[in-house]
Amino acid sequence: KGVILTAKHHDGFCLWPTQLTEYCIRNTPYKNGQGDIVRELSDACKKYGIKFAVYLSPWDRHQANYGTPEYVDYFYKQLHELLTNYGDVFEIWFDGANGGDGWYGGAKDSRTIDRKTYYNYPRAYKMIDELQPQAVIFSDGGPGCRWVGNEKGFAGATNWSFLRAGEVYPGYPNYRELQYGHADGNQWVAAECDVSIRPGWFYHPEEDGRVKTVDELTDLYYRSVGHNATLLLNFPVDRDGLIHPTDSANAVNFHKNIQKQLEKNLLAGLSPKTSDERGKAFSAKAVTDNDYDTYWATNDDVTSATIEFDL
């Protein structure tokens, strides 16, 4: 379990005292300009045994030089700061939203970039592998884990953990297929389902009565984790910098509900029946033997099979 902090969103404001722009927490009243939200959350994660990760938006609607090679260097310097100053980072989250309207350097403008080539993402992968080799890299196409193709928190009922290598990139236009993965893929890129506990990603007091209920959150769990994906649940902090009490209570009770529903393994010890199996080494018993290294498999010429449990 871990926390992913939005260290910089599309607006370009940095929640850490970066040395690269004045548009950051250093120039706010918070702690008289001595604050560092990234540091505070990283330290809290260490204290409570939670993994820490960062979201860094490639798109920056504030920087005057966005769309030029100089901005790309700026972006990588920011990434370097986050990778080297806050201890272990378990995931780096790159958004696929890039280019568009903004107040670039104070001038209202629209910028267009080539999403496939502009950021030179192999440079990011190399930097992350060198500085945080254990970190999972998230983007539309990974390479560590992928976007699921929607922001509603669910994966397809059939969801392959594979993509065709080199085909999907941040800003990939055929993103809806990411909900299912590629059955003929050759690169392991598991899906991550992102969704907010509220109607949107940011806090609005008028939405205090529209927080997802325990039942709604439980349904999302089964349609994400239950569909071979991970669940990333967004919590918009309120104007006091806190998670609203309703959001917090619903999340805690959601966790309790899942624990209660899954406390007993209904299939443990059962001997299922199958329409086909590849000998004793890959028999149906492997499904319920509680051993992650064993599995049921069919013969090579069988592409459709059934498994039946008698409860």
List each model region and its residues:
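Extended extracellular/luminal ectodomain segments enriched in beta-structured repeat modules
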Residues: 302-304
